[in-house]
């Protein structure tokens, strides 16, 4: 009987048993290994994540197949609303002045182109207008006056204004001249107003030609006029001229008498006009002794 070969078998028996016992793997570990290997395979085969451009290309639809409307921004919406609601301009209310109001306003403008606040208020109360209406009317009238003076100013060859200004702005004379500006009980007189018109302030009323004139002269006295010798001559001439008519009146029938009286009346009117003419001539000679009375049209 051989012991040698049996020993190694006995010795190797537990090791072999142990190896045999350890070789078969349990099911749980085998499943875990399979899942881990599958995960590794999946990570290897999965493609990389797409970039942002790829996402945009994929998400952007085709305009021909499915068009998409973009929402409007709030600023664009406000602009469209403003365009739809166009503001309507308010029409200016035109003041219709009466003829009397226009006459008073133009008369005051000719005298004084710039009024103070108190003067405008007084004028508006008189004309039953508002202060703004009077102020606006004066402003418009001043603009018209300046424009008229600019267009009518005398100019030289170079187009520059020269010489004094033209006459006053004729805006007042374009209105009706027959309106009663200072009618009693209607509107107050402007005589008490102090006007700053240079034509009145610069006038020399105390001239020698006026102050040295003797107004109490016999030339202006009625008695002196009646006592003039030429007056008696005209009276005698009138009596001599009417004397034949009086004689015909006594020796003529009624129809001839009427004709004679008509002729005498016409002659009397002619004589009266002649007397008035000579009276005026005598007044001229008394006032202006050196004034030539027999002026012919060729001498002018």
From Swiss-Prot:
Kindly provide the name given to this protein in its UniProt entry: Homeobox protein NANOG
Which species expresses this protein natively?
Bos taurus
Q: Where is the composition biased (Polar residues)?
A: 31-50
User: Which residue intervals make up region (Sufficient for transactivation activity)?
Assistant: 190-234
Q: Where are the residues of the annotated region Required for DNA-binding?
A: 117-146
| Primary localization | nucleus
Region of interest called 9 X repeats starting with a Trp in each unit, as start-end residue ranges on this chain: 190-234
Q: Which terms are listed as keywords in the entry?
A: Activator, Developmental protein, DNA-binding, Homeobox, Nucleus, Repeat, Repressor, Transcription, Transcription regulation
Assembly information from the UniProt record: Interacts with SMAD1. Interacts with SALL4. Interacts with ZNF281/ZFP281. Interacts with PCGF1. Interacts with ESRRB; reciprocally modulates their transcriptional activities. Interacts with NSD2.
GO MF annotations, alphabetized: chromatin binding; DNA-binding transcription activator activity, RNA polymerase II-specific; DNA-binding transcription factor activity; DNA-binding transcription factor activity, RNA polymerase II-specific; DNA-binding transcription repressor activity, RNA polymerase II-specific; lysine-acetylated histone binding; RNA polymerase II cis-regulatory region sequence-specific DNA binding; RNA polymerase II sequence-specific DNA-binding transcription factor recruiting activity
Xref: PROSITE patterns: HOMEOBOX_1, HOMEOBOX_2
Q: Which InterPro entries match?
A: Distal-less_Homeobox_TF (IPR050460), HD (IPR001356), Homeobox_CS (IPR017970), Homeodomain-like_sf (IPR009057)
- Describe the family membership recorded for this protein in Swiss-Prot or TrEMBL: Belongs to the Nanog homeobox family.
């Amino acid at each position: 009987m051989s012991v040698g070969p049996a020993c190694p078998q006995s010795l190797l028996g537990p090791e072999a048993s142990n190896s045999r016992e350890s070789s078969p793997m349990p099911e749980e570990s085998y499943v875990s290994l399979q899942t881990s290997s599958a995960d590794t395979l999946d990570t290897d085969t999965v493609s990389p994540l797409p970039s942002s451009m790829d996402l945009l290309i994929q998400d952007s639809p085709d305009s021909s197949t499915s068009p998409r409307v973009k929402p409007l921004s709030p600023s664009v919406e406000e602009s469209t609303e403003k365009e739809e609601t166009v503001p309507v301009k308010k029409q200016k209310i035109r003041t219709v002045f009466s003829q009397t109001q226009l006459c008073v306003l133009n008369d005051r403008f000719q005298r004084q182109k710039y009024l103070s606040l108190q003067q405008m208020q007084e004028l508006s109360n008189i004309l039953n207008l508002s202060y703004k209406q009077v102020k606006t009317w004066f402003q418009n009238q001043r603009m018209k006056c300046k424009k008229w003076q600019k267009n009518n100013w005398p100019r030289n060859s170079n187009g520059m204004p020269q010489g004094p200004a033209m006459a006053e702005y004729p805006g007042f004379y374009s209105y009706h001249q027959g309106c009663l500006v200072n009618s009693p009980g209607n509107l107050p007189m402007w005589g008490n107003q102090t006007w700053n018109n240079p034509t009145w302030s610069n006038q020399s009323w105390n001239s020698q030609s006026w102050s040295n004139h003797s107004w109490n002269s016999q030339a202006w006295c009625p008695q002196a006029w009646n006592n003039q010798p030429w007056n008696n001559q005209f009276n005698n001439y009138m009596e001599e001229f009417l004397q034949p008519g009086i004689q015909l009146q006594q020796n003529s029938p009624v129809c001839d008498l009427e004709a004679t009286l008509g002729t005498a009346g016409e002659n009397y009117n002619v004589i009266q006009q002649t007397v008035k003419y000579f009276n005026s001539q005598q007044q001229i000679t008394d006032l202006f002794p050196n004034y030539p009375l027999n002026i012919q049209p060729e001498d002018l």
